[in-house]
């Protein structure tokens, strides 16, 4: 099975270490452009753009990077309760047209009650999912060209319609991640691709089976994806050393404050991430080559695959064997790590790469010439 591999745009900050300003770098438009263009050239299928008050706006970032990329797709956030479904449908169609069919959408219900209240959304967990189902039903139908009247508990529209359709027909794909039963019910009914954070394979298999069963009961099939960090090096020893360096500036106070902040979230997925490490930096390898160190201070995706290329590829294939075809990766710093993943991991996987334009570039693709006129030795790809 060919795998879709996406990268990540760190619109909330980037650096060499977690929990410190040492090694941090400015994430301005020029830097985001560097990462997007690297991902585009290296063969990543798309980039996930995060959402929330700690991030730049995902839609504006995506729109700004369309002209400087050629094949890269942009996975941007739909926020039920923050924007109306009909306006979101118009925006989605516009972004798809402007990008010539390179727009994808990630439904985000939110998990931080404090942030949601600041955005004017005062629904509890169950109510947010009720509203998200209503939002998605309307958004899908409008984007597919239907005239929509809808009288729901949370949302009511009359005569909603879209005058200018998207490039992708019947509409761009909808992604979504959530671990609660309400989230799985929504995924089974509404989305094309269900995402999970990087839990151990047995836990991921259980979630996939649950969503697959719920979707089948509605006569639907759902694809599956996973969100993970990657720390890949030429040797396993180098990779584990890099993992330790990433958290080498974390002290107990920083970890404690981060975990206390994340504890207020009502996201089941966030609770499952936190349970993997329990706020303790000992025994962070929670499954072979699956390391929970990132989650000590980072909300959301908190685990990384660690190892050399063949080792990480073997773990990726374990997830693929469960039915996962889409992997959304990231690494610190995101520019350098995009190259490491492409150069050290891609050769060991069947990666579904976007078609590359044929160019007559001046620089040869085989490396630097030896002694001015000798071609470097070629290396077989396994």
Swiss-Prot record:
GO terms, biological process: alkanesulfonate catabolic process
Top-level taxonomy: Bacteria, Pseudomonadati, Pseudomonadota, Gammaproteobacteria, Pseudomonadales
Keyword Oxidoreductase annotated: yes
E.C. designation(s): 1.14.14.5
HAMAP family named in the record: Alkanesulf_monooxygen
Gene name per UniProt: ssuD
InterPro entries reported for this sequence: Alkanesulphonate_mOase_FMN-dep, Luciferase-like_dom, Luciferase-like_sf, SsuD_RutA_monooxygenase
Domain of life: Bacteria
A GO molecular-function annotation: alkanesulfonate monooxygenase activity
Signal peptide start-end: none
Enzymatic class: oxidoreductase
UniProt keyword terms in alphabetical order: Flavoprotein, FMN, Monooxygenase, Oxidoreductase
Full protein name: Alkanesulfonate monooxygenase
NCBIfam families for the chain: alk_sulf_monoox, PRK00719.1
Chemical reaction(s) catalysed: an alkanesulfonate + FMNH2 + O2 = an aldehyde + FMN + sulfite + H2O + 2 H(+)
Keyword RNA-binding: no
PANTHER family for the chain: ALKANESULFONATE MONOOXYGENASE (PTHR42847), ALKANESULFONATE MONOOXYGENASE-RELATED (PTHR42847:SF4)
Family: Belongs to the SsuD family.
Protein function: Catalyzes the desulfonation of aliphatic sulfonates.
């Amino acid at each position: 099975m060919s795998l879709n591999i996406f990268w990540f745009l760190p619109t909330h900050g980037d650096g060499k270490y977690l929990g410190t300003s040492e090694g941090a770098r400015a994430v301005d438009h020029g830097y985001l452009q560097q990462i997007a263009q690297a991902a585009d050239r290296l063969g990543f299928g798309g980039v996930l753009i995060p959402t929330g008050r700690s991030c730049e706006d995902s839609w504006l970032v995506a729109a700004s990077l369309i002209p400087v990329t050629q094949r890269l797709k942009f996975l941007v956030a739909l926020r039920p309760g923050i924007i109306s479904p009909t306006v979101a449908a118009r925006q989605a169609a516009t972004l798809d047209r402007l990008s010539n069919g390179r727009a994808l959408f990630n439904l985000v219900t939110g998990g931080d009650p404090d942030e949601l209240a600041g955005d004017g959304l005062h629904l509890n967990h169950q109510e947010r999912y009720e509203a998200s189902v209503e939002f998605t039903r309307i958004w899908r139908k409008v984007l597919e060209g239907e005239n929509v009247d809808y009288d729901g508990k949370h949302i009511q529209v009359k005569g909603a319609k879209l005058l200018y359709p998207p490039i992708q027909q019947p509409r761009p794909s909808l992604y979504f991640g959530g671990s609660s039963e309400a989230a799985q019910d929504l995924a089974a009914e509404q989305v094309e691709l269900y995402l999970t954070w990087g839990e151990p394979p047995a836990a991921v298999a259980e979630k996939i089976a649950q969503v697959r069963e719920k979707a089948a009961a509605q006569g639907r099939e759902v694809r599956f994806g996973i969100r993970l960090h990657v720390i890949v090096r030429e040797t396993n020893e180098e990779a584990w050393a890099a993992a330790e360096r990433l958290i080498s500036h974390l002290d107990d106070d920083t970890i404690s404050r981060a975990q206390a902040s994340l504890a207020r979230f009502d996201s089941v997925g966030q609770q499952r991430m936190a349970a993997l490490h329990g706020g303790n930096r000992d025994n962070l390898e929670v499954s072979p080559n699956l390391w929970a160190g990132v989650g000590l201070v980072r909300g959301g995706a908190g685990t990384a695959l660690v190892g050399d290329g063949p080792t990480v590829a073997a773990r990726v294939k374990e997830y693929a064997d469960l039915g996962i075809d889409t992997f959304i990766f990231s690494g610190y710093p995101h520019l350098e790590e995009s190259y490491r993943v492409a150069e050290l991991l891609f050769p060991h996987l069947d990666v579904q790469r976007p078609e590359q334009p044929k160019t007559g570039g001046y620089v040869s693709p085989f490396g630097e010439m030896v002694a001015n006129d000798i071609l470097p030795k070629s290396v077989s790809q396994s």
